[in-house]
Each structure stands twice: as structure tokens, then as C-alpha cells.
Amino acid sequence: VDAPADMVIKAPAGAKVTKAPVAFSHKGHASMDCKTCHHKWDGAGAIQPCQASGCHANTESKKGDDSFYMAFHERKSEKSCVGCHKSMKKGPTKCTECHPKN
């Protein structure tokens, strides 16, 4: 899979932004299966962004499976950044560890 080595995850257009964007390293996560995070990917086609319709398109709520916020912050799901980092006891789990203060 051809993924950008490093990228910045930003809130989708129209979302209420309260924290800084997050620097993300695909390279640093290369040992993981892509489907861990991109759970709707079929393994062959183009990978859609998290906020794609039918996935985490809800930018209004911080609750629910379709919530853009919960895609990254759900502590009880290993599919989210925070949940995976907590489960593995590795990686950032606090707000400012991912969202630098301006």
C-alpha cells in the first residue's frame, strides 16, 4: 500500500475545531495492518478518509460509531488512536501529546 510517510490529520471542513491538528506518521505504524484503522477498506481499492460518508462523517457529536471525534478518541476501541495506544501501553494518550498547544 502506498501511504504518505507523514501527514497531518485535520478536522473536516465545517467541524467545530477546538484543538490543533495532529501530526501522524504512517511510517511509524507500518508494522500494523492497515485495516486496523481503515476498518472499512476492502484491501484493494482506494482508502477513504475517516470522515467519508458511511464511516465517521458525523462532526456534530462526540458520541456514536459515526462520530469523527470517536474515530480517534474512543478509549474502549482498539480501532481508535487513544484506545489502541492504551491497549498497547505505548504511544500518546493525553490531549497535548497529540494536539500541541498553539
UniProtKB/Swiss-Prot annotation:
An example molecular function term from Gene Ontology annotations: heme binding
Iron keyword on record: yes
Textual note on the cofactor: Binds 4 heme c groups covalently per monomer.
Residues bound to heme c 2: H39, C50, C55, H56
Annotated positions binding heme c 3: H29, C81, C84, H85
UniProt keyword annotation of Heme present: yes
Pfam annotation, one family: Cytochrom_CIII
Keyword annotations from UniProtKB, A to Z: Electron transport, Heme, Iron, Metal-binding, Periplasm, Sulfate respiration, Transport
GO cellular component: a single term: periplasmic space
Protein location: Periplasm
A single GO BP: anaerobic respiration
Domain of life, source organism: Bacteria
UniProt xrefs under PROSITE patterns: MULTIHEME_CYTC
Gene3D superfamilies for the chain: Cytochrome C3 (3.90.10.10)
Residues the entry annotates as binding heme c 1: H26, C34, C37, H38
Reported cofactor(s): heme
Binding site for heme c 4: H73, C95, C98, H99
Job of this protein: Participates in sulfate respiration coupled with phosphorylation by transferring electrons from the enzyme dehydrogenase to ferredoxin.
Extra information: The second heme binding site has an unusual CXXXXCH motif.
Protein name, as recorded: Cytochrome c3
